[in-house]
């Protein structure tokens, strides 16, 4: 139905794959799991394994080729941009956004910069919640060439981040042009 009507579908499946891994020193989200133990799904009888959830999501993309999907949070592939690129190549009806996973991009600036250039028509700005102070970190990662700065939330990232220094045209697409293409009823003059 959405495909027939030209309505994009935002789809959020699973959570970070680390929430299914053992809570030990090899899990980069261990501190978040310590703070919020209800986010650990590794021993759940109710929540399916991560890969099963993602496979089901990809089956939906395959079955509904005429529907545009916005795969939230880089499809939880921010740690593997090569895999995410292959995913976008496989599913031309999928775009993505990077709400809550900017840290994964800021720790691999060269790879992330090239990924954004290569897939500039398939990436949209995303944010899980409105907190004005957090936007500065997003803008700093995307727009600057700053080095070795902190992420705003310690439970997500114990590494420093670096700016991607994206070209202006890529930034415009990520910030608003891609959204205007997907949602043509948004007044374009808001962005001129």
Where are these regions (language model features)?
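Divalent metal-binding pocket/active-site signature
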Residues: 1-83
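H/E-rich (His + Asp/Glu) clusters that bind or coordinate divalent metals
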Residues: 45, 51-59, 64, 68-192
């Amino acid at each position: 139905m959405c495909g027939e009507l030209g309505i994009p579908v935002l789809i959020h499946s699973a959570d970070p794959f680390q929430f299914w891994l053992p809570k030990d020193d090899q899990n980069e989200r261990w501190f978040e799991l310590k703070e919020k133990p209800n986010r650990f799904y590794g021993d759940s009888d109710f929540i399916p394994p991560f890969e099963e959830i993602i496979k089901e999501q990809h089956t939906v993309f395959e079955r509904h080729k005429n529907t545009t999907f916005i795969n939230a949070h880089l499809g939880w592939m921010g740690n593997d941009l090569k895999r995410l690129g292959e995913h976008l190549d496989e599913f031309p009806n999928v775009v993505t956004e990077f709400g809550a996973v900017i840290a994964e991009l800021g720790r691999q600036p060269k790879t992330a910069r090239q990924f954004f250039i290569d897939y500039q028509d398939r990436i949209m700005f995303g944010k899980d919640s409105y907190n004005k102070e957090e936007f500065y970190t997003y803008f700093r990662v995307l727009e600057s060439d700053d080095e070795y700065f902190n992420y705003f939330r310690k439970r997500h990232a114990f590494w420093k981040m670096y700016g991607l220094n994206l070209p202006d045209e890529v930034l415009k697409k990520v910030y608003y042009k891609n959204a205007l293409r997907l949602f043509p009823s948004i007044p374009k003059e808001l962005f001129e």
